[in-house]
């Protein structure tokens, strides 16, 4: 059911974090429910965009968790994670990114209970893509966004600055 996703992760596992990727692959293999489109209340797919502008990475302030995160969102039915990363980056920041990207990481994220949406605690398998900024001027952004250098970024994301060009 999730063979395409597993193949993408297996290509990444050759460059590190084999234990982490093995756990994610196990979850994908054992999942009998659709992971796209929030169909599964326990495990869902998401995708994040890593986009640099002048050596600074884009972050958004998450509306419920009130923390700085990469622009990201749920993978919709019929959508591939790369398409999600591109779409969410545009929606959340108002900027556009290239339609090609490089998968650089996959993470299992524990999502806390959301009392505003009445969503129970669950997990996301988050695909993180390095994208190139296409437009220098932003359109309408859904969320406040920030351009941060490595010293300003949350610790979890500092490792991604190795990809800046």
Swiss-Prot record:
Protein name in UniProt: Probable DHNTP pyrophosphohydrolase
Family from the record: Belongs to the Nudix hydrolase family.
Enzyme class, broadest EC rank: hydrolase
Residues covered by the Nudix hydrolase domain: 42-165
Record key words, sorted: Folate biosynthesis, Hydrolase, Magnesium, Metal-binding, One-carbon metabolism
Function: Probably mediates the removal of pyrophosphate from dihydroneopterin triphosphate (DHNTP), a possible step in the pterin branch of the folate synthesis pathway.
Pathway: Cofactor biosynthesis; tetrahydrofolate biosynthesis; 2-amino-4-hydroxy-6-hydroxymethyl-7,8-dihydropteridine diphosphate from 7,8-dihydroneopterin triphosphate: step 1/4
Binding locations of Mg(2+): 88, 92
GO terms for biological process, alphabetical: folic acid biosynthetic process; one-carbon metabolic process; tetrahydrofolate biosynthetic process
EC number(s) from the headed UniProt entry: 3.6.1.-
UniProt cross-references to PROSITE patterns, sorted A to Z: NUDIX, NUDIX_BOX
The species this protein was found in: Lactococcus lactis subsp. lactis (strain IL1403) (Streptococcus lactis)
Disulfide bond positions: none
Motif, Nudix box: chain positions: 73-94
Complexes and interactors: Monomer.
GO MF entries: hydrolase activity; metal ion binding
Gene3D superfamilies (UniProt xref): Nucleoside Triphosphate Pyrophosphohydrolase (3.90.79.10)
Cofactors, names only: Mg(2+)
């Amino acid at each position: 059911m999730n063979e395409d996703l597993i193949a993408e992760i297996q290509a990444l596992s050759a460059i590190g974090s084999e234990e982490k990727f093995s756990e994610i692959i196990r979850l994908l293999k054992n999942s009998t429910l659709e992971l796209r489109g929030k169909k599964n209340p326990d495990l869902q797919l998401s995708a994040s965009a890593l986009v640099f502008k002048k050596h600074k990475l884009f972050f958004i302030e998450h509306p419920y968790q009130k923390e700085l995160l990469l622009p990201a969102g749920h993978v919709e039915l019929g959508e591939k994670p790369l398409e999600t990363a591109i779409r969410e980056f545009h929606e959340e920041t108002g900027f556009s990114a290239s339609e090609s990207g490089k998968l650089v990481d996959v993470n299992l994220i524990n999502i806390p209970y959301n009392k505003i949406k009445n969503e129970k605690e669950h997990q996301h398998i988050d695909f993180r893509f390095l994208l190139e900024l296409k437009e220098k001027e932003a359109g309408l952004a859904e969320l406040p966004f920030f351009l941060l250098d490595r010293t300003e970024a949350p610790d979890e994301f500092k490792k991604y600055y190795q990809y800046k060009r």
